[in-house]
Regions:
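A short helix->loop->beta-strand "cap" motif at the edges of active sites that frequently abuts
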Residues: 20, 78-81, 97, 189-193
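Active-site neighborhood of phospho(di)ester-bond hydrolases with catalytic His/Asp-centered motifs
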Residues: 24-25, 54-68, 83-86, 141-146, ...
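Active-site HxH/HxHxD metal-binding segment of metal-dependent hydrolases
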Residues: 44-109
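Cap/insert and terminal regions of metallo-dependent hydrolase folds
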Residues: 87, 148-199
């Protein structure tokens, strides 16, 4: 069965695999700002997007606003199960989600035919998550900053979602390593398909 994907821009995806609909890192409403204020970085949506219906799972890679965007999360049904990094779990707990599973790198979530393994991701400043998602029919790897967990063993992955450019800021250094990591992902996963994400 084919994987269906809708890209919302930035880090946001709606994926459907084996009839399971997973919303990842959505930014659908309002401006995107980072502490200490919008004078540093401010993102604006050209148009607000309605939250998709029939979501089976909300998957959050990081607690930063471009991954766990509070105005967007406020408009999503709080009874939807959430899988999240440690920092993202704090965000959704504060907003009122009731079914939160926190995964640290190396930990796994299992539910019927769905298996989600957290991998070590970017350090912004704490270690955040990438994920390997498996069902009986499909497999996906996603890590939004291009940080590859060196403990992952070679295996076949159907779909890899990754940035494909490197990006640096004077204060933060290189915090997106897509161009650097892409050859490693190709060798490690031999993916059928690659989707490029942006931040």
């Amino acid at each position: 069965m084919a994987i269906k994907a809708i890209y919302y821009g930035a880090n946001g995806w709606l994926l459907e695999l084996d009839k399971i609909r997973i919303l990842i890192d959505p930014w659908l409403k309002g401006d995107l700002t980072f502490p200490p204020g919008d004078w540093l970085i401010k993102g604006e949506l050209a148009k607000e997007i309605d939250a998709p219906s029939d979501i089976d799972l909300l998957l959050l890679t990081q607690g930063q606003p471009d991954h766990s965007h509070p105005p967007t999360l406020e408009k999503i049904d709080k009874s939807i199960p959430v899988i999240a990094s440690q920092s993202a779990s704090k965000v959704v707990n504060k907003i009122g989600f009731t079914k939160i599973t926190t995964l640290k790198p190396g930990e796994t979530y299992n539910n019927q035919n769905l298996n989600i393994q957290a991998t070590s991701g970017a350090s912004v400043p704490n270690i955040e998550n990438g994920y390997i998602i498996d069902t009986n029919l499909n497999s996906i790897y996603i890590e939004p900053h291009g940080f590859l967990d060196k403990t992952i063993k070679p295996r076949k992955i159907d779909l890899v979602i990754t940035p494909v450019i490197d990006f640096s800021l004077p204060i933060a250094g290189k915090f997106i390593k897509g161009k650097t990591v892409l050859p490693q992902l190709l060798k490690l996963f031999n993916p059928t398909t690659i989707f490029a994400s942006t931040t």
